[in-house]
Amino acid sequence: MKRICICGGGNLGHVVAGFLAANGCEVTLLTRHPERWSHTLHITTPEGTTLEGQLSTISSTASDVVPQADMLLLAQPGFAIRSVLSELRDVLRPGIPVGSIVSSTGFFFEAMSLLPSTTPLFGFQRVPFIARTEVYGHSAHLLGYKSSLNLAVERASRDDGNRIASEIQQLFHCPTHLLASHYEASLTNSNPLLHTSRLYDLWHNWQEGITYESIPEFYSNWTDNASSLLIAMDAEFMQLLDKLQVTPGAIPTILDYYESTDAPSLTHKLQSIAAFKGIMSPMEKVGTTYIPDFHSRYFTEDFPYGLAIIHRLIHEHNIPAPHIDQVYDWGMNLISRYSD
């Protein structure tokens, strides 16, 4: 039986822990809130079934759950990655692979600076599931699967990298392909561009005093303006990949990934994805109206820990990126003013 330690209890932490436990793994959980968790997780699937997974140990202390693990898998927001890696490195057995479900918020950069060089590292290019928590610590919804997974592995031989990819394929019941370098997972045009372009489209004219009568759906109400901005940011991102000599095609363009040809067709595609239905824009209620929620992970994660990495590398390589600059500066300014 594979022993997996999940570090983190967000949407993906719930679903991945429940899915793996329901499929024969011994799952332990490292979370800041162990008192809120049940040892039994219920995960609904798109097929209408409910998976039941039993967690063996739940703790806020790394030494309780890390030493016995055969593999560690982080499901952490970007701001927490460094502190979690610092905590687990002292109790991690030599040679045990450490991975991250989300790779685009600095995991590889932090792990390579903090963990021993003998620790294999791996990370997903895109998350394996679309996930939403229902009752924290008890139940969640698995809303969508990927048809295949791409995995980056560092600090491992080619054979060991293939072995880790094979293990992930077995664990997630999904074809898994090995990427050429961690850049192909660390850098992505998924959330850091997808979310931030839409946020800019929604609220680039927002200022204090402006409120809204309702909350728009994030994807179902997607606009051509958001698509045009996303395509422009993606073109700048592709210049960075070329400069870094990332394997051509390893990270598909936004248009290729979503099987689109232009802004209107991209809008139609994003509006029509079933797993995206019902995902609302991040807003908070003020009286009877709404304002943008600057404490949402769409702001606190995707700007300072997602787009920031792309923005930094673009400037280090002297690549003109006016659209990325515009969106990044706008988002970071709002976060600095309103997310404290």
Regions found by a protein language model. Give the residues of each.
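Nucleotide donor/acceptor-binding cores
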Residues: 2, 147-149
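Short, surface-exposed amphipathic charged segments that create phosphate/polyanion-binding patches used
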Residues: 134-143, 189-197
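Active-site-lining helix/loop region of Rossmann-like oxidoreductase modules
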Residues: 150-256
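Short acidic low-complexity segments
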Residues: 54-68, 177
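NAD(P)+-binding Rossmann beta1-loop-alpha1 motif at the extreme N-terminus of oxidoreductases
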Residues: 1-50
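Short, well-ordered alpha-helix to beta-strand connector turns
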Residues: 24, 55-56, 69, 95
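Rossmann-like NAD(P)(H) cofactor-binding subdomain of soluble oxidoreductases
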Residues: 71-74, 78-140
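NAD(P)-dependent Rossmann-like dehydrogenase/reductase catalytic/cofactor-binding core
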Residues: 211-214, 220, 227-340
